[in-house]
Regions:
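Outer-membrane beta-barrel domain signature
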Residues: 40-44, 98-102, 150-155, 195-199
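Residues that define the transmembrane beta-barrel architecture of outer-membrane proteins
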Residues: 21-23, 45-51, 103-107, 155-161, ...
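Short structured motifs
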Residues: 112, 148-150, 164
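Bacterial Sec-dependent N-terminal signal peptides
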Residues: 1-28, 210-216
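Gram-negative (and chloroplast) outer-membrane scaffold detector with strong preference
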Residues: 23, 31, 58-142, 169-173, ...
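Short glycine/proline- and aromatic-enriched beta-strand/turn motifs that initiate or cap beta-hairpins
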Residues: 20-57, 213-215
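Predominantly the C-terminal beta-signal and adjacent terminal strand-loop region
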Residues: 70, 76-82, 152-216
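Outer-membrane beta-barrel translocator domains and adjoining extracellular loop/strand segments
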Residues: 37-43, 79-86, 137-146, 190-196
Length: 216
């Protein structure tokens, strides 16, 4: 494995040196607004706001056309603010708020094409695909001191479509900031168990991302 790693570095390093003017690297962070869909119960969950952090690389094919890839760590949440009926110690039904939250931690790899436009090519749209790998998931509830590990209830792989819109703020010849709104639309059923009413569980994540890009 180490030999393969060094072979890849040996091959790629000269290419990076030759094409360094066409390649931008970056670090990014932001917020995601995540929700689930595919069945009535999942769609009743309230979307959750959480965070993402990652790194990026962008290769320019032309001045206004490029291919980008990110590797992001994404924390996704969905909340159940419904009511649960329980039987108390005297045998009477009582209603409490569930206040539970599903938490998913993913590594997400989006690959997409950017098209720049405007007088200074400072606006852009993009589209492509993403691949997600589930690190872990859990169910957290205010009514319990312990979280429930739900990792085994979900498939490890998620994948879907990516599309977004953004603005470039040029800092100098080698550095810029990009502010982007991006949609990750999951297309796979992520549940590893049968879903209520023969449904599915699919992810949806709307991202607000700030990316610092630089040339080496």
């Amino acid at each position: 494995m180490k030999k393969l790693f060094f072979v890849i570095i040996f091959i790629c390093f000269p290419l990076i040196l030759v094409a360094q003017d066409k390649i931008k690297f970056g670090v990014n962070g932001g917020l995601n607004y995540a929700s689930l869909r595919g069945n009535d119960l999942a769609e009743d969950l309230a979307p959750g706001i959480s965070y993402l952090v990652g790194v990026s690389a962008e290769f320019f094919l032309k001045e206004n056309l490029s291919i980008s890839a990110n590797l992001n760590y994404e924390n996704k949440t969905a909340k159940d603010n419904g009511n649960v009926y329980l039987i108390d110690e005297y045998g009477f039904p009582t209603m409490i708020k569930s206040d539970s939250k599903s938490i998913y931690n993913y590594l997400v790899l989006p690959v997409y094409v950017n098209y720049y436009f405007g007088k200074k090519d400072d606006f852009y749209v993009n589209g492509g695909l993403f691949l997600g790998y589930l690190l872990n998931s859990k169910l957290s509830s205010k009514n319990s001191d312990n979280d429930t590990d739900t990792t085994d209830m979900n498939k490890k792989i998620d994948a879907g479509l990516v599309f977004g819109f953004g603005k470039v703020f040029q800092l100098n010849d080698k550095n810029n900031l990009k502010l982007e709104i991006r949609e990750n639309l999951g297309m796979l059923n992520t549940s590893d168990f049968d879903v209520y009413n023969d449904g599915t569980i699919k992810t949806n994540s709307l991202n607000l991302i700030l990316n610092w890009n630089f040339n080496l």
